[in-house]
Amino acid sequence: MQRLPGVGPKTAQRLALHILKRPESEVEALAQALVEAKKQIGLCSVCFHLSSEPVCEICRNPNRENNTICVVADSRDVIALEKTREFKGKYHVLGGVISPMDGIGPEQLTITPLLRRVSQQQPKEVILAISPSVEGETTTLYVGQLLKPFTKVTRIAFGLPVGGDLEYADEITLARALEGRRELD
C-alpha cells in the first residue's frame, strides 16, 4: 500500500487492516474493479490524458476551442484545471517532468508528439501549466524553447493561494506573485 502516491506507513497500515476486516467478497470485488480499471483505461491518442476510448472526451468535444493547447505534466493536472471550468481549450499531457535524477529525460515524455501536434494544428497559443518545482521549471523552459518558433507560448501565473498570508509565503512565491501582478479591472 505504501507504494501508492501519498500513502505513508500509517495510512498503509490502516488500509491494510480495513481490507483484512472486510468480507472476502468485498475484497475480491475491489481487486476485480482495480484489474478492470487497469484493462479499460488507457491514454488518449491525441493528448495522452486518461481515457477509456482511443480519443478522450475532451479531444472529441466539438465545443472545445482548438486554437489553445494547455500542456500539463500529469492527468491529475487536467482534472484540477477542469474543476475550475475556466479553460475551454484542449490539453496535452507530458506524462511527467524532466528529472535526470530519476532517469527521466525529454525522450521519456510526450514532447515529440506535442511538437508534431502543434506543427500540424497550428494553435494560436500553447499554455504551459507545469508546477514550479525545479524539474517543472526545467521542463517548462525546455518545452517553451521548442515551441516558440511555432506559436505563442505562455505559462500560468504563480503566486499566493487564496486566503494565504503574506508573512507565511516564501521569497520565491512572493517574487512570482509580484511578477504575475495585473491591473485591477
From Swiss-Prot:
NCBIfam families: recR. A zinc finger (C4-type) spans 44-59. The keyword DNA damage applies. This is Recombination protein RecR. Pfam families: RecR_C, RecR_HhH, RecR_ZnF, Toprim_4. Belongs to the RecR family. The gene is recR. The keyword Signal does not apply. Residues 67-161 form the Toprim domain.
